Structures are given as structure tokens and as C-alpha cells.
């Protein structure tokens, strides 16, 4: 039984059930409710509005049924259950009187069975009804609109019969009875089963090996796949005070019903930096589906690569896209396609690398026909919007910069792929190296080389470390420090393996590089041309035009493109987009065909085509032209900004002093190399100074602050790659701010190393805000060199553990300028308490410590209290969202009783009861400095509040007391009123969220306006 109250309590779950399937499932529930006469015809018409989001219709249905009383609620739950059961094993047999005297009524009573019987025959029935004059041509065309599935067309025919009085209902009742009964579900048809089998085989073959990261051998995905840090994006600012940082998720959470930004959208977005493992994640999804291990709710999975789709020049339809560009049905093409249209909820489409799709997303051109051809970009954009294959799931991967606000409107859930955790790096290396001792030595090398360890949180760098393990373990010099160092190491690895045996033991010396310089320049020219033309997949004709021969290809940087339709000639692509950028930078540094002046376009990150001149420049071919400068400049101007930034950083690294001798031996003119270096230095300094000049003046009374623009981090990265201290000093000379914000900027360990390299030269200390990034423990270690230039450091929501904070504090003890630390929303436990206590005890100029939303218990609070006893400077202490309990509150209260400087204390959401409140009340009686005490979200109850009220009577400093959501009744409020009568200092007492009646709230507010209810 289900009462109306129980029904209302289940409302959110019922909405989830109704919208979790497809529109077909929702309409089958309406069929049942109509046939049981739970819904009237007027109710039904209000629930079948075309174009309305399914969630709106579901809520309207719940409202309609609730108004019909307990019986209606029970019937809806029964209909949901029956619809779920019938989707597994439908009962197609229905019995009705074909010669009924009330045909319209019988059509409604037997509607579910009639819809199922009509499903496979609706086109023939429409033709017959038109021929016999029961419907007009206009009515027939309306029912046959391509946006409707076969079952929806059947329902619309029945709806028409209900309102027409010309015998259509009697005709249908008689004719449908004669139709053959299907003995199985439509997708059990031989054609569909054969197609599903073929599709699984093809997807399994395409996804079993990781060929994109290796030109010499294939790596079995099952053997080396390592979970990446995947977090769901939430709307910042929408969460309450106890909002936790996103938890790391598994692949199975991609289609979870939680965390929806837009529950009516179909598209799941996965964003991550270049090399973070987006393509490999999709490949693992494909493999798990194809081998039957997961994602079996989908009958069909269609993988696509955006870099390959953009090469499709001719118009194509949904059918062409699925069949010609993924998997062709050997038989029954029309039947298979019709099933796909009828069951979109059983389809998953994946689109990898949207950042490599040269067309910018727009929703201006609507295309709703699955059979009419259109351009590839219009087709893709309408699939993502849901105008085509609505309710089919689509997964889109991209680098963050390529995702516009327009596109995010159509995103159901957004995930952030943050790369490997420290444990992930170790696990990956152990999977790659099962020989005794090799993985241990590599892991030890990383742990003792923080710069290299910081790079490896991106899987592409972990792969490089694995690939170059011999070079790393045997080399006498220092380990790679910059991204450029790492790519030169992998270049050395590829060159050695392609060289004669007697040269295989050499490092990347001039002779090894010179021997392959023509090959590298040809590959670099192809890479640059591809970047400028947004071309990442190269045909045989394009390779021939670039004079790239089989010997060049054998070097290993070009591999067969994945996801190629069987039987077609496989085009080639670079191992990874970052390799394409690296080789393009190599060409720009060493080619005699590149004028030095062209390099300035690398550091000017305007959108391609932003000037009239760039739009007038002709499309250029790979071969050189007599206008060399305009050719290179045009390609750089048309390169996507994120690829341009990566290329610029590589160019800066190649022109560093570290690699000067290596490149000078390969460059005919050392003077030319020096000119390029000078040009890059000038461009970097100029771009940074221009950036700093754009900072608006400070608001009167506030510190001058700067929120980094997108290009700022890449300029800093380029400075770091160049490794020139003097240039870093000159660059920050113009930075005159007190607060530097880099929130939500994708700052990882590598970016931390670059920031530290530059910011340590600041003349005036700054407050550095790095909230909502991926700093982690390794990133904290990278930041240590610039800690002396920071007066405040904000690291909210950065996946930092005790180990990282202990290292930070060890260094901070010697940094006189550092006065504030914000560490909330991390993974801190009692294990860091001794270090934090030491910080408080030793730094007598320290002002603010915020440790909210971590995992500190009473034990940690007791240790911290010892540090507080020896501290005389702290003004702000944030502990909200921990688990200190009564014992922890007692320890902190005792330590703060005679503290002379603390003004603000937050213990929100710490499981504090009346015992802890009594200790805090005793503290209030003695403390003469505290101005604000935040105790919301605890369970103080009246006993605890009465104790606090006694403390207030003897307190002369507290101005704000926050007691919201503490189960306080009128008794506790009365005690507070008595205390307020003798306390003129206190200005506000927050009592929101406590169980007061409206009458009590009105009475309390009239008695003292300082009570905020």
C-alpha cells in the first residue's frame, strides 16, 4: 500500500525513475494509466507536449496523480513496475472485441497491447487508413514526422482515432486484431543480433591495444590500464557551508544519476589537459563494453574521433555516420537503423578530442532529421544538443579551453580528468615493468626527483618515464626537470632504437641528432602545417606532399590512426598532440626556412582569424613558398591557442642554455640560433609586461589583486622551460599586486614548479590563491622555493594530504613573511597536527589558519591546542566540517581562554554537544578578544545554549554568535534573551534552522532584534 504521504516522500526517487529511461518508457507508463482510467483524456493531453523536457513532464505527472488520491498514487507505482517488467519480457497478446459498440473506449482500455501490436506495422496501417479515407494526407504526414519513433507514431494514430468520429477507431480495432503477433522483442531480430555481434567485435579489436602511445610495439590495454583521478564538476557557490571537495570516481560513475548539471541533456563531458588520459579512458570504456564486463545497459556503442570526423568533406546523415564511419550492417540496414531510432536509450556514442575539431560549437543551425544529410559539424552539434538521437548517451572528451559556455548548456554531467595520483603513478610503472627491481628503481628515482615526479601525474609523462627507463636509470647527469627535457629524452630513445647498434649506447649527442636532422625537419614541417590547418590525421597524399617517406615514418613518431573503418587505407597521426607540437617547435628552432620574426606569433595568443589580414591569407600547402615569413606566420596565426601555447613552451625550452650546445651543432648558423633565442626572450618579457599592465587599479581600501588570464600560466610555463633566472627576475619586475589569484586554472605540479621558478623573484610578498586546482603533495613540494615570497597561501580543494602539509610547514617555519594558510577541503588528518601545532608555537606573527572540511578528530584538536597555548598572534582559526567532538572542543576552549589575539573561531559541523558547549561557555567568561564564534550544524540543544548564555553574561568582546541548526527550542532562546539583556556588546545571534513555530519566531524577534531567525 502507498499513502499520499509515502508517495510524496518518494517523489525524488520517482522522478529519477521516470526520467532515467527514455521517452518511450515514460509514454508506456502513460498508456497503462490511460487504460486503467487513472488519467482522463485532458490529463493525458497535458502530459504529451512535444518538446517539453522529460523531467518537467515527470513532475507534472506526479502532481496530477497525487491530486487523484491514494488510489491514483498506488496505480502509478504499479504502472512503473509493470513498465519495467514488460521492457524485459513484454506480453504482446491482447484480447478485445473487434466489433465492439464502443471502439474508442476499447482502444483506450487495451492501449498498451495495441501499441505493441502496431509497432512493427504502423506504416502499412497508415497507408491503409489513408487509402480508405479515415485520415487525410496532412494527418498522415504529421504522424510520419521523422522525429517520432514507430511506437510514438502508433500512439499518435490512436490519439487521432480518439477524437475523430468517422470510424477510424472501429477500423483500427478490427485491423490491428488481424496483425501477426511478434514472438520476440524487436532487438532479437536476426539482423540486429548480427549487427550487435559485429559491432562488439570491431570495437574490441580497436580498443584492445594502446597503439597511440607507442610507435614500436602495442601495449595491451588490459595489462596496463590504471585508474585516473576522475572528479565530477559541481556548481561552485551552490553548495552549503559543509560542501565537501569532489570525490575520486570510477568509470562506472560516468552515467550515474547524481551530479547532473542539466538532467534533460544527453551529453557527458570529460575534460582534461593534454596527456591526462582522456583517449585511454574512452578506450577502456569501449573495451569493457565490447568484452561484456561493464556498460551492458547499452546495446550499441559507436566510437568516433573528432580529428578524423573533421576530415569528412561530404554531407552525411545519422545513418551514414553510424554505418559508413563506424560499422556497416551486412543485412537489414533499414531494420537495424529503425531499431536504433526507436531505442536511442540503448545507444552510446563517444566523441574523442573535441578540442581537435576545427569547427567551433554553435546551436544556431538546427537539424532534426536522422535521414537527411548535412555537414559533419552540423550533425555533431545537433547530436550533442539532443536534436538527433535524443536520449542516446553521448560522451565528449576535450581540453578545458575548447569547451564554450554555449556547449555547456547541453551537458548533462561534466567530469574533470586530473591525471594519476601518486599511487596511480607507482601502480602504472609496476604494471609496465614486471621485471625484478626495475619498477622499484624507477619509483625511487621519481621520489627523489620532485620535478620529474611532478610531470608524471600526467599519464603521457608516466609512459615516457616507462619507455625511457634505461636512459633515466643509467644517465650520469641530472634527471629531466622540464617538459622539454622529457621530450628530448624520448626523442633520444626513438633515435637510438632507429640507429645502428654501435650508436645505441650514446646519449642525445650532436652526431645522433645530425644523422636524423632531415627526417626531424620534415616531420616538424608536417607537424606545423597540421597545427596551422587544424589537421591531425594525414593521408598518403599529404605525407607525399610533405616528402615524408617510409624511413621517416619508421622513426616511430607517426602511427596508424585509431578507429579506422576496416578495409580502408589507414591514415597516420602523431603519437600524441604534444608530440606534434614538440616537432613543430623543433622545426621552428632549426629550420633555415623559418624567419626569426615569425616566432613572435607564438606568444600572441589571439583567436585564429581575429584580424582582417589573417582572414585574407590563402590556405597554404605543406611545401615551402617564396613568402617564407608570411607562410609560417599564417600557420601560427591559425593554430588553435592551446596548441600554440604548448608549441611556444617547447620552443622556449629548446632555446634554453641547457640545450644550446646540442642545437648549435645542428644549426648551420649559430648567429641565427642566438637571434631566435633573443626574439623568444623579448616576446616573453613583452607579453608578461603587457599582461601586468592590463591589471585594473585597486579598489579603494582593498589590496590590489590579479586573477590570472588563460594565457598567463602558459607564459610562466614558457619562462620555466627556458630556465633563465635573469629573465624571470625581469619578468616579475612589473608585477605590482598584493593578491595573485589562480583559482580553477588547472594548476598541477608542473605549473607549481613554473610558478615557484618565477614568483620567488618577487620584490614584495603576495597572497597566492590556488584554490580548486590539482596541486597535490607533489605540487606543494614544487611550491616551496617561492614560499618566502608569499604572505598568504590558499590551497583549498587540492587533494593535499598530511605528507604535503608537513613538508610545507617544515619550510614555512623559516619564512618570515608567511602569515596565513588556508587548507580547507583537502585530505588532512590528525597525522599533521604536530606540524601545525609547531607552526603555531614557533611563528609569533602568524595570523590565520583555516583547516575546515578535513578529517581532524578530537585527538588532533588536542595536539593543536598545545600549539595554541604558546601562540600570541593568531586572529582567525577555522575548523568547520571536521570531527573534533566534545573532547576536541574542550581542549580548544581551554587553550583559548586567555588567548589575547584570536578574533574569529569556527567550529561549524563538528559534532559538538552540550559538554563541548559548556567548555566554550567557560572560555567566553575569560576571553577578552574573541569577536565571532561560529557553532552552526552541531547538536548543542537547549542545555548547551543555556551554558553559552551564562558565558555571554560575563563576556565583553563577542559580537556575533552563530547557532543555526542546533535543535534549539524556545527554552534555549529564552536563556539567550536573558543574557542579551545584560550584554550590549553582542550584535547578532543566529538561530536560523532551529525548530521554532511561526508564533515563537515572531515573539522572539519582537523581544530582541539581535536574534536572527
Curated annotation (Swiss-Prot):
Keywords: Adaptive immunity, ATP-binding, Autophagy, Cell membrane, Cytoplasm, Glycoprotein, Immunity, Innate immunity, Leucine-rich repeat, Lipoprotein, Membrane, Mitochondrion, Nucleotide-binding, Palmitate, Repeat, Ubl conjugation
Binding annotation for ATP: 272-279
Lipidation (S-palmitoyl cysteine): 368
PTM statement from Swiss-Prot or TrEMBL: Palmitoylated by ZDHHC5; palmitoylation is required for proper recruitment to the bacterial entry site and hence for proper signaling upon cognate peptidoglycan detection. Palmitoylation promotes localization to the cell membrane. Palmitoylation protects from SQSTM1/p62-dependent autophagic degradation. Polyubiquitinated by TRIM27, leading to proteasome-mediated degradation. Polyubiquitinated and degraded following muramyl dipeptide (MDP) stimulation, conferring MDP tolerance and preventing septic shock.
InterPro entries: CARD, DEATH-like_dom_sf, Leu-rich_rpt, LRR_dom_sf, NACHT_NTPase, NLR, NLRP_HD2, NOD1/2_WH
GO cellular component: basolateral plasma membrane; cell surface; cytoskeleton; cytosol; extrinsic component of plasma membrane; Golgi apparatus; mitochondrion; phagocytic vesicle
NACHT domain ranges (all copies): 266-402
Keyword Ribonucleoprotein: no
UniProt remark on domains: The ATG16L1-binding motif mediates interaction with ATG16L1. Intramolecular interactions between the N-terminal moiety and the leucine-rich repeats (LRR) may be important for autoinhibition in the absence of activating signal.
Oligomer and partners: Homooligomer: homooligomerizes following muramyl dipeptide (MDP)-binding, promoting RIPK2 recruitment. Interacts (via CARD domain) with RIPK2 (via CARD domain). Following RIPK2 recruitment, RIPK2 homooligomerizes via its CARD domain and forms long filaments named RIPosomes. Interacts (via CARD domain) with ubiquitin; inhibiting interaction with RIPK2. Component of a signaling complex consisting of ARHGEF2, NOD2 and RIPK2. Interacts with ANKRD17 (via N-terminus). Interacts with HSPA1A; the interaction enhances NOD2 stability.
Family membership noted in the UniProt record: Belongs to the NOD1-NOD2 family.
Listed name of the protein: Nucleotide-binding oligomerization domain-containing protein 2
Amino acid at each position: 500500500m502507498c499513502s499520499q504521504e509515502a508517495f510524496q516522500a518518494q517523489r525524488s526517487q520517482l522522478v529519477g525513475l521516470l526520467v532515467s529511461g527514455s521517452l518511450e518508457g515514460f509514454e508506456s507508463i502513460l498508456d497503462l494509466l490511460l487504460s486503467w482510467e487513472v488519467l482522463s483524456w485532458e490529463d493525458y493531453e497535458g502530459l504529451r507536449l512535444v518538446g517539453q523536457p522529460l523531467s518537467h513532464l515527470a513532475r507534472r505527472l506526479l502532481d496530477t496523480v497525487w491530486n487523484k488520491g491514494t488510489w491514483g498514487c498506488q496505480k502509478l507505482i504499479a504502472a512503473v513496475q509493470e513498465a519495467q517488467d514488460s521492457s524485459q519480457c513484454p506480453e504482446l497478446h491482447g484480447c478485445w472485441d473487434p466489433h465492439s459498440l464502443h471502439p474508442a473506449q476499447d482502444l483506450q482500455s487495451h492501449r498498451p497491447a495495441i501499441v505493441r501490436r502496431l509497432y512493427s506495422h504502423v506504416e502499412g496501417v497508415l497507408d491503409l487508413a489513408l487509402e480508405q479515407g479515415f485520415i487525410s494526407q496532412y494527418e498522415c504526414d504529421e504522424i510520419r514526422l521523422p522525429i517520432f519513433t514507430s511506437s510514438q507514431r502508433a500512439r499518435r494514430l490512436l490519439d487521432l482515432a480518439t477524437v475523430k468520429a468517422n470510424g477510424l477507431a472501429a477500423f483500427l480495432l478490427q485491423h490491428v486484431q488481424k496483425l501477426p503477433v511478434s514472438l520476440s522483442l524487436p532487438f532479437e531480430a536476426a539482423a540486429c543480433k548480427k549487427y550487435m555481434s559485429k559491432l562488439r567485435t570491431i570495437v574490441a579489436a580497436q580498443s584492445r591495444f594502446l597503439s597511440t602511445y607507442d610507435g614500436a610495439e602495442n601495449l595491451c590495454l588490459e595489462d596496463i590500464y590504471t585508474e585516473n583521478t576522475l572528479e565530477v564538476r559541481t556548481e561552485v557557490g551552490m553548495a552549503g557551508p559543509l560542501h565537501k571537495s569532489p570525490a575520486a570516481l570510477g568509470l562506472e560513475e560516468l552515467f550515474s544519476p547524481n551530479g547532473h548539471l542539466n538532467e534533460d541533456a544527453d551529453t557527458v563531458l570529460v575534460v582534461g589537459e593534454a596527456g591526462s588520459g582522456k583517449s585511454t579512458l574512452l578506450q577502456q570504456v569501449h573495451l569493457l563494453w565490447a568484452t561484456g564486463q561493464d556498460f551492458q545497459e547499452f546495446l550499441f556503442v559507436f566510437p568516433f574521433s573528432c580529428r578524423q570526423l573533421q576530415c569528412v568533406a561530404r554531407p552525411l546523415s545519422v545513418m551514414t555516420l553510424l554505418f559508413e564511419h563506424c560499422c556497416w550492417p551486412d543485412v537489414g540496414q533499414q531494420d537495424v537503423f529503425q531499431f536504433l531510432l526507436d531505442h536511442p536509450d540503448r545507444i552510446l556514442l563517444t566523441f574523442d578530442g573535441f578540442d581537435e575539431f576545427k569547427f567551433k560549437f554553435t546551436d544556431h543551425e538546427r537539424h532534426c532529421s536522422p535521414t537527411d544529410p548535412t555537414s559533419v559539424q552540423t550533425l555533431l552539434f545537433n547530436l550533442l544538443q539532443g536534436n538527433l538521437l535524443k536520449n542516446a548517451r553521448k560522451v565528449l572528451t576535450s581540453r578545458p579551453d575548447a569547451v564554450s559556455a554555449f556547449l555547456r548548456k547541453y551537458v548533462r554531467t561534466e567530469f574533470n580528468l586530473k591525471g594519476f595520483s601518486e599511487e596511480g603513478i607507482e601502480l602504472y610503472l609496476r604494471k609496465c615493468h614486471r621485471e625484478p627491481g626495475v619498477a622499484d628503481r624507477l619509483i625511487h628515482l621519481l621520489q627523489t626527483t620532485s620535478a620529474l615526479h611532478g610531470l608524471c601525474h600526467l599519464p603521457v609523462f608516466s609512459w615516457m618515464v616507462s619507455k625511457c627507463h634505461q636512459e633515466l636509470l643509467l644517465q650520469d647527469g641530472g634527471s629531466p626537470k622540464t617538459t622539454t627535457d622529457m621530450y628530448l629524452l624520448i626523442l633520444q630513445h626513438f633515435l637510438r632504437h632507429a640507429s645502428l647498434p654501435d650508436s645505441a649506447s650514446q646519449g642525445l649527442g650532436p652526431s645522433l641528432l645530425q644523422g636524423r636532422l632531415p627526417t626531424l625537419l620534415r616531420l616538424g614541417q608536417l607537424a606545423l602545417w597540421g597545427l596551422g590547418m587544424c589537421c591531425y590525421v594525414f593521408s598518403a597524399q599529404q605525407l607525399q606532399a610533405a616528402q615524408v617517406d617510409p624511413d621517416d615514418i619508421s622513426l616511430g613518431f607517426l602511427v596508424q590512426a585509431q578507429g579506422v573503418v576496416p578495409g580502408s587505407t589507414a591514415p597516420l597521426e602523431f603519437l600524441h598532440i604534444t608530440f606534434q607540437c614538440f616537432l613543430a617547435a623543433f622545426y621552428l628552432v632549426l629550420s633555415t626556412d623559418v624567419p626569426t620574426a615569425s616566432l613572435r606569433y607564438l606568444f600572441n595568443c589571439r583567436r585564429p582569424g581575429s584580424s582582417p589580414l589573417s582572414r585574407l591569407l590563402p590556405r597554404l600547402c605543406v611545401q615551402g613558398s617564396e613568402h617564407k615569413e608570411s607562410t609560417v606566420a599564417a600557420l601560427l596565426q591559425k593554430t588553435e591557442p592551446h596548441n600554440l601555447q604548448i608549441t611556444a613552451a617547447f620552443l622556449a625550452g629548446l632555446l634554453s642554455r641547457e640545450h644550446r650546445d646540442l642545437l648549435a651543432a645542428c644549426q648551420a648558423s649559430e648567429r641565427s640560433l642566438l637571434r631566435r633565442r633573443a626574439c623568444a626572450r623579448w616576446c616573453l618579457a613583452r607579453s608578461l609586461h603587457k599582461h601586468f599592465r592590463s591589471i585594473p587599479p585597486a579598489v579603494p581600501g582593498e589590496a590590489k589583486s590579479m586573477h590570472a588570464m588563460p594565457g598567463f600560466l602558459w607564459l610562466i610555463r614558457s619562462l620555466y622551460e627556458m630556465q633563465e633566472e635573469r629573465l624571470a627576475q625581469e619578468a616579475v619586475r612589473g608585477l605590482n599586486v598584493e593578491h595573485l589569484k589562480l583559482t580553477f586554472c588547472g594548476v598541477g605540479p608542473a605549473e607549481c614548479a613554473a610558478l615557484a621558478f618565477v614568483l620567488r623573484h618577487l620584490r614584495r610578498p603576495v597572497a597566492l590563491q590556488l584554490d580548486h586546482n590539482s596541486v597535490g603533495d607533489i605540487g606543494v613540494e614544487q611550491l616551496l622555493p617561492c614560499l618566502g615570497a608569499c604572505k598568504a597561501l590558499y590551497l583549498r580543494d587540492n587533494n593535499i594530504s598530511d605528507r604535503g602539509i608537513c613538508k610545507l610547514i617544515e619550510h614555512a617555519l623559516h619564512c618570515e613573511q608567511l602569515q596565513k594558510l588556508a587548507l580547507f577541503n583537502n585530505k588532512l588528518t590528525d597525522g599533521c597536527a604536530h606540524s601545525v601545532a609547531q607552526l603555531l608555537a614557533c611563528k609569533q606573527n602568524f595570523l590565520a589558519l583555516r583547516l575546515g572540511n578535513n578529517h581532524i578528530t578530537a585527538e588532533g584538536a588536542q595536539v593543536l591546542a598545545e600549539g595554541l597555548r604558546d601562540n600570541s598572534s593568531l586572529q582567525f582559526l577555522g575548523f568547520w566540517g571536521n570531527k573534533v567532538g566534545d573532547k576536541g572542543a574542550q581542549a580548544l576552549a581551554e587553550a583559548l581562554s586567555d588567548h589575547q589575539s584570536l578574533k574569529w573561531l569556527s567550529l561549524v559541523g563538528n559534532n559538538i554537544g552540550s559538554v563541548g558547549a559548556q567548555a566554550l561557555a567557560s572560555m567566553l567568561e575569560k576571553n577578552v578578544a574573541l569577536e565571532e564564534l561560529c557553532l552552526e550544524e552541531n547538536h548543542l540543544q537547549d542545555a548547551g545554549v543555556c551554558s553559552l548564555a551564562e558565558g555571554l553574561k560575563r563576556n565583553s568582546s563577542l559580537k556575533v554568535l552563530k547557532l543555526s541548526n542546533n535543535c534549539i527550542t524556545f527554552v534555549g532562546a529564552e536563556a539567550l534573551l536573558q543574557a542579551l539583556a545584560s550584554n550590549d556588546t553582542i550584535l547578532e545571534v543566529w538561530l536560523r534552522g532551529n525548530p521554532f513555530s511561526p508564533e515563537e519566531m515572531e515573539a522572539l524577534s519582537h523581544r530582541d532584534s539581535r536574534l536572527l531567525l
